[in-house]
């Protein structure tokens, strides 16, 4: 009996050990992951509200759920379940606390329109605070808690509405779009008051500390490229003519009053309007005057928040722009002092931070951070000690999955310039003579990049799912190299300008030097190479397979194959002028840098993926490249995703896109998972 008990115990221990082994990561695992899309600390600093986005395959949408957690730690609790968080195309709640902390505002659906809802923290039913016919795109409580300011489009003219109903409506391309207005409304009722003229398209705003004035940024037209044509104004909540605060060319946006009301901080390209211009941080007197640039380096500012003493500003740099070279894969929260512009990191380590907010006394700072191989969690930082506390674990199942090792790598390019990248290797792989099939993943942009995290390119795009399932590829035995060539983030503004009139030149050579380095180091098998990427990464993928036959498989998504297409057909066409001038001014260069010109050289089996309604990278380019390759007997397949834009937003399509990419590289490269499971070095 005793022997039987011992045998049973040993069997149970062995079984537990088997079940405890981490299992491989799959595409379906990627579709179960949750993302934190918004974080906001309460004014008293004692609670943090956040929203989690979850893919719902049954409904084919990404759903948002609101939670509240104590800043000192503990269990999160669900809030506001009666409010359906705005999720077109993805959850975008824009959490905002009232100044007394009694109400939590967010954007949710009222019918099919996004409106501002207030959720009482002391109990009671949620209620809609706005009833805009066109919905609300942004809002802010007034500091005194009496009013709400928000953005909404002008309503559709009655005649246009009639024409749309009877199918007689015609789109007049030169007709101005309806303006986005800044509106103010008292919380206790009353008629909303429009504060801005129909000639302005407002994109951001903030309240003055005394609740009497609103500062806002606006362009004279709408559209994607209008972000580089913004000015800053202020207007009284009682109405009247707007006052010009910053009047210069380029981007001037995200105005934020200092707590003492004397200054306005804003993001600016300092008089330049091309896409490569550094988005720095400036301050200007609240009533107008000469502005002053605080950051003299190449940091691109994303979000900002004043310290409560008005002496410094916290900000988040866009990925790879504040810390260059080996730190380019980080996105730390940074603090800059207004008096002399000195700046330093607030959050140390390999961290990628977003959605920062401060308590009313400035002692606590809440944010979303991606640390290690995660999708991000909620953290609270003690401003005095610099100690950060993790409050959530939104994807605990990651602890049961075998994840690859992600590390930064460096190599020398053709001109001896150091180029950096990230290298993902399979779980348990050790550099012991076993070469791996290598997939090169090209980032978008051109000014984009990679950061640390589970989906290295899309950690900065809230709840966006990567079309290339790098972690599932690692589990299938692939290594994935994510190069950061010049032209993208990490090398300053000069690095971005290095590819002007030269796409596919130095950037291509930087990438290929990385491939050669991985082969020379015994990591990559030179006979099992693949390449993939979307947007500019799609362009680079298409370009690579026209320049070399070294790759056995390629997948190009949302790609630019004929460079005249984005100028003539894209919503961002003017940005092509920044790189190549206009097509009739530089015809030879447009052709010389277009993959379509060299379609006859392609020998690599190519998968082309494109959203049917892509306005950024027109689908015409996918069709042209496909037809050119097909007519010449090349191995090519074209997948078109109905309703899809420049990226896909429907979970069913996202899953299929990932499956197709994994199946394509597996088919042509025929990877096998590593046989050994020795510890990674």
Language-model-detected regions and their locations in the chain:
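Serine-hydrolase catalytic core recognition
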Residues: 310, 352-681
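Residue-level detector of Asp-centered blade-edge/turn motifs that repeat once per structural unit
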Residues: 43-44, 99-100, 143-144, 209-210, ...
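Beta-strand-rich domains and repeat architectures in extracellular enzymes and scaffolds
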Residues: 28-64
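A flexible loop/linker signature enriched in serine peptidases of the S9 family
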Residues: 52-65, 81-92, 105-117, 131-137, ...
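Short loop/turn segments that connect beta-strands within beta-propeller blades
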Residues: 70-74, 120-124, 186-190, 236-240, ...
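A short beta-strand motif characteristic of beta-propeller blades
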Residues: 27-31, 77-80, 127-130, 192-196, ...
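Hydrophobic beta-strand positions that form the internal "hydrophobic ladder"
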Residues: 48, 101-104, 145-148, 214, ...
């Amino acid at each position: 009996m005793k022997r039987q008990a011992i045998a049973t115990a040993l069997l149970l221990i062995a079984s537990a050990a088997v079940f405890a082994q981490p299992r491989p990561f799959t595409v379906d695992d990627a579709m179960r992951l949750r993302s934190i899309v918004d974080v906001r600390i309460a004014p008293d600093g004692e609670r943090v509200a956040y929203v989690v986005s979850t893919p719902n395959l049954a409904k084919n949408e990404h759903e948002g759920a609101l939670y509240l957690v104590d800043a000192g730690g503990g269990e999160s609790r669900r809030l506001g379940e009666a409010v359906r968080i705005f999720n077109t195309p993805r959850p975008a709640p824009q959490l905002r606390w009232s100044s007394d902390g009694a109400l939590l505002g967010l954007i949710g659906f009222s019918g099919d329109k996004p409106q501002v809802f207030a959720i009482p923290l002391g109990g009671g039913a949620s209620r809609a605070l706005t009833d805009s016919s066109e919905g609300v795109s942004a809002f802010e409580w007034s500091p005194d808690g009496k009013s709400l300011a928000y953005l909404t489009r002008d309503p559709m003219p009655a005649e246009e509405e009639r024409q749309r109903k009877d199918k007689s409506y015609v789109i007049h391309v030169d007709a101005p779009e309806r303006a986005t207005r800044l509106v103010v409304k008292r919380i206790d009722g009353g008629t909303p008051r429009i504060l801005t003229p129909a000639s302005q398209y407002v994109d951001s705003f903030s309240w003055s500390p005394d609740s009497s004035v609103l500062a806002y940024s606006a362009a004279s037209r709408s559209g994607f490229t209008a972000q580089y044509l913004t000015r800053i104004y202020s207007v009284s909540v009682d109405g009247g003519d707007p006052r010009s605060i910053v009047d210069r060319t380029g981007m001037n946006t995200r105005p934020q009053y200092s707590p003492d009301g004397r200054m306005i901080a804003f993001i600016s390209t300092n008089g330049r309007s091309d896409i490569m211009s550094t988005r720095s941080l400036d301050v200007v007197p609240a009533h107008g005057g000469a502005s002053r640039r605080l950051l003299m380096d190449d940091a691109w500012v994303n979000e900002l928040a004043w310290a409560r003493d008005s002496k410094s500003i916290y900000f988040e740099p866009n990925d790879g722009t504040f810390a260059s070279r080996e730190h380019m894969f980080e996105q730390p929260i940074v603090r800059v002092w207004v008096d002399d512009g000195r700046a330093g990191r607030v959050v140390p380590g390999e961290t990628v931070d977003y959605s920062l907010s401060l308590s009313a006394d400035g002692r606590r700072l809440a944010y979303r951070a991606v640390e290690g191989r995660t999708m991000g969690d909620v953290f609270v930082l003690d401003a005095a000690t610099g100690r950060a506390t993790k409050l959530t674990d939104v994807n605990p199942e990651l602890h049961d999955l075998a994840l690859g090792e992600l590390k930064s790598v460096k190599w020398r390019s053709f001109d001896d310039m150091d180029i950096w990248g990230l290298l993902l290797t399979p779980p348990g792989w050790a550099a012991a003579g076993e070469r791996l099939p290598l997939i090169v993943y090209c980032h978008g942009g051109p000014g984009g990049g990679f950061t640390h995290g589970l989906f290295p390119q899309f950690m900065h795009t809230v709840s966006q799912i990567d079309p290339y399932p790098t972690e599932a590829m690692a589990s299938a035995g692939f290594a994935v190299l994510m190069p950061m060539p010049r032209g993208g983030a990490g090398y300053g503004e000069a690095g971005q300008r290095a590819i002007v009139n030269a796409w596919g030149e130095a950037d291509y050579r930087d990438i290929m030097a990385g491939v050669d380095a991985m082969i020379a180091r015994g990591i990559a098998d030179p006979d099992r190479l693949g390449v993939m990427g979307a947007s500019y990464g799609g362009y680079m993928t298409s370009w690579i397979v026209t320049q070399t036959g070294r790759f056995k498989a390629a997948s190009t998504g949302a790609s630019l194959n004929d460079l005249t297409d984005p100028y003539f057909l894209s919503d961002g066409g003017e940005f092509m002028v920044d790189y190549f001038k206009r097509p009739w001014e530089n015809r030879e260069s447009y052709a010389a840098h277009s993959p379509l010109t060299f379609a006859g050289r392609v020998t690599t089996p190519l998968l082309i993926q494109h959203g049917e309604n892509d306005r950024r990278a027109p689908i015409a380019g996918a069709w042209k490249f496909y037809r050119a390759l097909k007519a010449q007997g090349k191995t090519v397949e074209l997948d078109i995703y109905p309703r899809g834009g420049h990226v896909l937003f429907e979970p069913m399509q996202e899953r299929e896109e990932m499956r197709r990419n994994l199946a394509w590289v597996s088919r042509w490269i025929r990877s096998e998972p590593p046989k050994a499971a020795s510890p990674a070095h």
